[in-house]
């Protein structure tokens, strides 16, 4: 029975290949035919039903220039599919679909901020796109969004439609396959993840930034030579993906030759960057902290904190990181100042409460208050093994 299931899964994958190839050639009839033939294999895997039904809806939309009314609901994946279908059909409701998605409290849908910005630029709503990225912080945004923010701040609007367009059905299906690849990656099924990632790249090779997931998959599999090969796709033209490349190369050096050599490598690359972005400063501070070079980490954290506005959301986290570095050096006065200020900004941060409480207990200082903080931290995150 296991062999039968394996064969059925392979048959389904083979049909997905045929469907993808038909879509690439703009042959919707053939894609639909192969999809119908795959029907008997879609129940063999929990993702296959989602893939089958989503592709059925997309092909119907591309072929008939309207949205299928009789369709199954897969929760947030259906919301994502609906947003792209409306965008493809140039419906005004695409805007509300993207907004519903990125404001959804049931998960992290920040990737779709990129597609909302792309939609705004495609519809000549440049000022609205500027407003969206104005709300993003470089330090705590995803790789794709930091690059997007940089493009808009440098007026490089054409770069968005160069890599993705809602008018192109292949770009849309490519993004859906990328989503499936991400789902498999989150299950540590890197072989399946790379299968869908390769299909995604086949349909839209312009979206070279998606190869960062390929690099991550190979890295998690400790296939470092393949990681290095993929990373060569990222050059200085897209500075945040180039920085991602440097960081990943550094991690490989650390794993193979130790922290000292890794820190030397990233430091030499960092020094060559003119006017490095705060995100890059933040990353190198974290590398120094992880390598126990706390003085250097403090120097960089201080530089970032000094540049932030008083109401910056990320200040609390930076004070926590700098405070932890002071604590490791035995400078308890400054450590306590930073950690208490971090809690003043965000009183319910369980990790900060936990860290400060244990620091005080180890010093036999403010014991009653420390125990109260521990109890509060546990109440906030009682399912967290680190609390």
Identify what each model region corresponds to.
Residues 3, 192-200, 266, 339, ...:
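Amphipathic alpha-helices of TPR/Sel1-like and other helical repeat/solenoid scaffolds
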Residues 1-261, 275-294, 314-328, 350, ...:
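Alpha-helical solenoid repeat scaffolds
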